[in-house]
């Protein structure tokens, strides 16, 4: 069991379960009482959670990836298999292929995710490389760049 594996590790976890899994997670937490895990249905101050995190485990939606890039957060991405055209796997691979994230498939997550987390957290060089690489992929000032491009197109059409 993954929770049994992390109890006693010198790592703090914030576990956002979502509303659907909240009650089941609360039962597991009450039974196991892991002192190094904070479970919540929803993280209302995500900026604080990101700031505290050395590593983020996340789905691979475009918004999540953009946040990770802008903040330069190392991540292990677990693409959702329940999305159109498997686009989350494509999103994740765009980072993985640039050594800007690691990926664990949804079906492999129960067996491999916690070990991948602990292995990466114990390798500060790899953690820094991933963080630096993902930060380098960030599109800073995206709105300004889009607006500038729109104005360029308008000027050409005059």
Regions found by a protein language model. Give the residues of each.
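Donor-nucleotide binding loops and adjacent catalytic segments primarily
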Residues: 1-55, 88-92, 97, 104-113
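Acidic donor-binding loop of glycosyltransferase active sites
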Residues: 51-64, 73
């Amino acid at each position: 069991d993954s929770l049994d594996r992390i109890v006693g590790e010198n790592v703090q976890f914030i576990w956002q379960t979502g509303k659907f899994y909240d009650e089941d997670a609360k039962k597991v937490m009450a039974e196991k009482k892991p002192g190094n895990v904070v479970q919540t249905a929803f993280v209302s101050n995500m900026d604080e959670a990101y700031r505290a995190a050395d590593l983020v485990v996340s789905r691979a939606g475009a918004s999540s990836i953009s946040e990770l890039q802008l903040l330069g957060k190392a991540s292990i991405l677990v693409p959702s298999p329940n999305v159109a055209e498997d686009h989350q796997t494509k999103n994740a691979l765009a980072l993985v292929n640039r050594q800007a994230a690691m990926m664990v498939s949804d079906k492999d997550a129960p067996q491999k995710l916690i070990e991948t987390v602990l292995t990466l957290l114990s390798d500060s060089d790899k953690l820094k490389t991933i963080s630096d690489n993902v930060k380098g992929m960030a599109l800073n000032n995206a709105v300004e760049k889009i607006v500038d491009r729109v104005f360029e197109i308008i000027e050409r059409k005059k």
